[in-house]
A protein has these predicted regions:
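Positively charged, low-complexity intrinsically disordered leader regions
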Residues: 1-62
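Glycine-rich phosphate/dinucleotide-binding loop and adjoining beta-alpha-beta core of small-molecule
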Residues: 2-18, 58-209
Length: 209
């Protein structure tokens, strides 16, 4: 086994960005073969999160984690990762930025003890509030931002390879409120009393046209 090359490939996957078509081409044979990519991505994200917490001498059961969750499969990745972390004892809240959630991942997350904060008044998520007023929507957004700002780790699972252009609507608003619209942080865990990590589960980019 060529472990040196394996390590190089892992580093490349962790720290490189690929356009959406390339990601789809890489995924297609694995999906055709029935590889459980969503569960694998979630497990990897959860493991990286636990490693970051350990590096900061913070026990998982003492950690407060925010998962920014969109409606698609990337949101499912985040929910499954959140479920793993919740089962390990972390306090995990999923901040739902869209009107629905990946059904199976949502069920796994709730079963693991995760909590859900819905931001869209038109959301249709089982067991969660819906049809609330514009005033309450603003209060929920503020609560979500404050929760994320006070979290040790933020998992960004709002969008995946299906998105094009800048973030809009609730995802755009919450990203701007958290200061996540510019460059990535210099290091994943900040040197303060409450380390924070922005861990995109997947970043797909198109080159400028």
């Amino acid at each position: 086994m060529d472990t040196a090359n394996d390590a190089d490939r892992l580093q490349m996957l962790l720290y490189s960005a690929y356009d959406s078509d390339t990601v789809r081409d890489m995924e297609r044979p694995l999906l055709d073969d029935g590889t459980p990519l969503m569960r694998m991505a979630a497990s990897a994200a959860a493991q990286v999160t636990m490693t970051l917490l350990d590096d900061e001498d913070l026990a998982v059961e003492d950690a407060r984690i925010a998962v920014l969750v969109g409606t698609g499969d990337n949101g499912g990745d985040g929910l499954y990762a959140g479920a793993i972390l919740a089962r390990e004892g972390a306090q995990v809240t999923a901040i739902a930025t869209g009107r629905s959630l990946h059904d199976a991942a949502f069920a796994a997350f709730v079963h693991a003890g995760g909590r859900v904060l819905v931001l869209d008044p038109n959301a249709d998520i089982p067991g969660c509030a819906t049809g609330f007023s514009a005033g309450e929507a603003g209060e929920r957004l503020q609560a979500a931002v404050e929760y994320a700002q006070g979290s040790h780790v933020i998992l960004d699972a709002m969008t995946g390879i299906g998105v094009a252009g800048a973030l809009r609507g609730i995802p755009g608003t919450i990203a701007a409120s958290l200061g996540l619209t510019s460059r990535l942080p210099d290091r994943p865990a900040l040197s303060n009393n409450e380390p924070s990590a922005d861990l995109p589960l997947g970043v797909a980019v198109y080159p400028p046209s």
